[in-house]
């Protein structure tokens, strides 16, 4: 790893012709740490220790695939002329919102198959997801991507950032906003809040709280980024999706509180799939 010239090599090490990149290592570490944290929550509600294995396995696979499809779709003018680049996820280009959609769909399907309550599982994994996202942003840092607009070195020094961050934000002759860091800090704060409040919230509200918290932060950070996926020349996809997620989450939480008066998470115990077929 070369840091002497202010540059961290995205490749951690090589095994023959195979390059092992920091991007993948960091994302894997985020998922692994999130898994262990979620395991502790399983025990607290009385669910079996192996409950999350299938959910995480399939959600991770489907999530990565959908995240890549999502990214490629909005960058199709480039990829249509560079088809060989589509599977190269180690170069970056994984959209979190796409991963969230894919992971959510596969998670619900597995919950149905395993007869698990999706809101309870969502509450269990929500803090882990946002923490993994916060850790994963450091993979963007290593890849020199997902940064904001140009700034001066003096600006970065004014933020009292560690020197290795300042050096690595010097990309092709210019310093840039470390937007990866802003979002990472926001996500870690969200993790602490969700873990702290989870027991006091109604069933499902920790997961929707995650969607709200993450989306608010993403909306503002996205405005600073230079590599946003664009729906039109003025509408950033991530900002639009963030607004939609916030509205859906707020409406759903209010509706469930008024209509169903859901139980608290801490009183839930082991729950099964809540939707029954009409007789």
UniProtKB/Swiss-Prot annotation:
Gene that encodes the chain: lgt
Native source species: Staphylococcus epidermidis (strain ATCC 12228 / FDA PCI 1200)
Main localization (coarse): membrane
Record's function text: Catalyzes the transfer of the diacylglyceryl group from phosphatidylglycerol to the sulfhydryl group of the N-terminal cysteine of a prolipoprotein, the first step in the formation of mature lipoproteins.
Membrane topology: Multi-pass membrane protein
InterPro entries (alphabetical): Lgt (IPR001640)
GO cellular component, one term: plasma membrane
Entry EC number(s): 2.5.1.145
TM regions (residue ranges): 22-42, 52-72, 89-109, 203-223, 235-255
Binding site for a 1,2-diacyl-sn-glycero-3-phospho-(1'-sn-glycerol): 137
PANTHER family: PHOSPHATIDYLGLYCEROL--PROLIPOPROTEIN DIACYLGLYCERYL TRANSFERASE (PTHR30589:SF0), PROLIPOPROTEIN DIACYLGLYCERYL TRANSFERASE (PTHR30589)
GO terms classed as biological process: lipoprotein biosynthetic process
Top-level lineage group: Bacteria
Pathway(s) this gene product operates in, as recorded in its UniProt entry: Protein modification; lipoprotein biosynthesis (diacylglyceryl transfer)
GO molecular function: phosphatidylglycerol-prolipoprotein diacylglyceryl transferase activity
Keywords of this entry: Cell membrane, Membrane, Transferase, Transmembrane, Transmembrane helix
Pfam families per record: LGT
Keyword flag Transmembrane: yes
Family listed: Belongs to the Lgt family.
Keyword RNA-binding: no
Locations listed in the record: Cell membrane
Species classification: Bacteria, Bacillati, Bacillota, Bacilli, Bacillales
Protein name as it appears in the record: Phosphatidylglycerol--prolipoprotein diacylglyceryl transferase
């Amino acid at each position: 790893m070369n840091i002497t010239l202010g540059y961290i090599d995205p490749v951690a090490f090589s095994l023959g012709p195979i390059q092992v990149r920091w991007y993948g290592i960091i994302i894997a570490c985020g998922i692994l740490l999130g898994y262990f944290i979620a395991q502790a929550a399983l025990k607290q509600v009385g669910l079996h220790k192996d409950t999350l294995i299938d959910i995480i396995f399939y959600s991770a696979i489907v999530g990565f695939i959908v995240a890549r499809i999502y990214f490629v779709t909005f960058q199709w003018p480039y990829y249509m002329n560079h088809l060989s680049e589509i599977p190269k996820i180690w170069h970056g280009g994984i959209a979190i919102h796409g991963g969230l959609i894919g992971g959510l769909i596969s998670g619900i399907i597995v919950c149905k198959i395993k007869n698990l309550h999706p809101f309870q599982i969502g509450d269990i994994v929500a803090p882990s997801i946002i923490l993994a996202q916060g850790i994963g942003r450091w993979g963007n840092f290593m890849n020199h991507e997902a940064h904001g607009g140009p700034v001066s070195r003096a600006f970065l020094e004014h933020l009292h950032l560690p020197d290795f961050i300042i050096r690595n934000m010097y990309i092709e002759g210019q310093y840039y906003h470390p937007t990866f860091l802003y979002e990472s800090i926001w996500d870690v704060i969200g993790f602490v809040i969700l873990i702290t409040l989870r027991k006091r919230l109604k069933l499902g509200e920790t997961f929707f709280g995650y969607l709200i918290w993450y989306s608010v932060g993403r909306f503002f950070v996205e405005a600073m980024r230079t590599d946003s996926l664009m729906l039109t020349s003025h509408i950033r996809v991530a900002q639009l999706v963030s607004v939609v997620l916030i509205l859906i989450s707020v409406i759903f939480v209010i509706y469930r509180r008024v209509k169903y008066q859901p139980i608290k998470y801490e009183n839930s115990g082991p729950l099964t799939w809540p939707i029954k077929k009409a007789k």
